[in-house]
C-alpha cells in the first residue's frame, strides 16, 4: 500500500496545474525529465467556452551540455477540435546565462520569437452596446531580445528591444482598418476608430523596453507580506509605419500589510493582511490604439469585462483588499476604482465615447480562496448589479 501511495505522489509531482489568467483557463502540464536534459510537455487548456479546448506542446533543452544556455519551443492550437492555420501559436526562446550563478549581478540574455492573437478590449461596447460592436482581433508576430540583471536580492532590472508586426482582423479574419459598429437596421458601419497607426490594418513597430521590479515580499505561514513595486517604460523608436514615436510608462505599487503578529510555523494560522494597491499609466506621442490602457477586467477593476470602462492614454487604478484567515484558507473583502483621467478622448477615434463607455468605474465585493480558485461576489457600482465570478490565481 505504501508503494502505491509513493507512486501516486511521484505522479502528482509531474502534473503541474496552473492558471492561464490571459485566456481564463487551467493549464495542466506533464513534465518528462530525461538524462540528457531534454524537457517535453503537453497539455490541454479547457477555456470558459466549453466547446473549445486548447492543446499545447513544449520541447526544450535546458542547460544544453552544461553550457549555461537553453533552447525552448512551444506550439499551441487554439481549438484542437477545429484547427486553423492562423490559430496556430508558436514560440521559440533561447536563453544564455552571461555570468556565473554565484556572482551577485547574474545577467541573463534571452531572445525569443513568438506570435499571438487576442480579442481587443478597446473595440468592445459599453453597457447596452455589447452586442452592437463586433469583435476585433489583434495578431502580433514579435522578435524580442532582453537582458535581465539581479541588482540586489530584491531588485531586478530587465531591458531590451522588440520588433513587431501587428495585424487587426474582424471576426471573419479579414484585415480591418477601422473598428466596426452595427447599425439599427442590422448593417455594419466600418467608420469606427482606426485600428492601426498606418490606417491599413497592418503596423510595423520597433520598441525599446525596460522595467525594474522591487520585491521584498515573504510568506508568513503561507500569507504574502511585504511590498512589490514595478516601473515599466516602452519607448517607440520611430521605426515603422508613420514613424511611431511614443513613450508608454506605468508604475504599480502594492503593499501587503500584516495586521497581527503570529507565531510562525508549518501548522500555525495565517495573519490577517491588508492589501493596498495603486497603478498609474501614462502615454505620450503616437501610441496605437491596441497598446493604450484598457480599463476594466480581472486585473484592472474587478466585476467588469476587459475594457468595459474605457481605453485611455492615462489611467489611475486604486484597490484595497483585507484578507481574514479561516482554517486552511482565507476570506476577503475588496474595493477597486479605475479612472481614465479624462484622457479617453485623446485616443484616435475616441473608441470610449463612440462605444458608450463611462471612462471610470468602481466595484466592491466579498470572496473566498478555494485552492487556486477565487470565488467572488462583485457589485459593479456603475450598473448597480452584482454577479458571482470564479478566478484563478491571485489578483495582487
Swiss-Prot record:
Protein role: Mediates the insertion of proteins targeted to the outer membrane of chloroplasts. Required for the import of protein precursors into chloroplasts. Forms the voltage-dependent preprotein translocation channels (hydrophilic beta barrel) of the TOC complex in the chloroplastic outer membrane. Required for etioplast formation and/or etioplast-chloroplast transition during deetiolation.
Residues in compartment: Cytoplasmic: 33-87, 149-156, 281-292, 371-384
Protein name, UniProt field: Protein TOC75-4, chloroplastic
InterPro entries to which the protein is assigned, alphabetical: Bac_surfAg_D15, D15-like
GO cellular component: chloroplast outer membrane
Tissue specificity comment: Expressed ubiquitously at low levels.
Keywords: Chloroplast, Membrane, Plastid, Plastid outer membrane, Protein transport, Transmembrane, Transmembrane beta strand, Transport
BP GO annotations: etioplast organization; protein targeting to chloroplast; protein transport
Transmembrane segments: 24-32, 88-96, 141-148, 157-164, 272-280, 293-301, 364-370, 385-392
The family this protein is said to belong to: Belongs to the TOC75 family.
Subunit structure: Part of the TOC core complex that includes a protein for the specific recognition of transit peptides surrounded by a ring composed of four proteins forming translocation channels, and four to five GTP-binding proteins providing energy. This core complex can interact with components of the TIC complex to form a larger import complex. Chloroplastic protein precursors also interacts with these complexes.
Domain of life: Eukaryota
Subcellular location per the Swiss-Prot or TrEMBL entry: Plastid, Chloroplast outer membrane
Membrane topology: Multi-pass membrane protein
Keyword Plastid in record: yes
Pfam families in the record: Omp85
Chloroplast intermembrane compartment segments: 1-23, 97-140, 165-271, 302-363, 393-396
UniProt free text on domains: Transmembrane regions consist mainly of membrane-spanning sided beta-sheets, which are not predicted by sequence analysis tools.
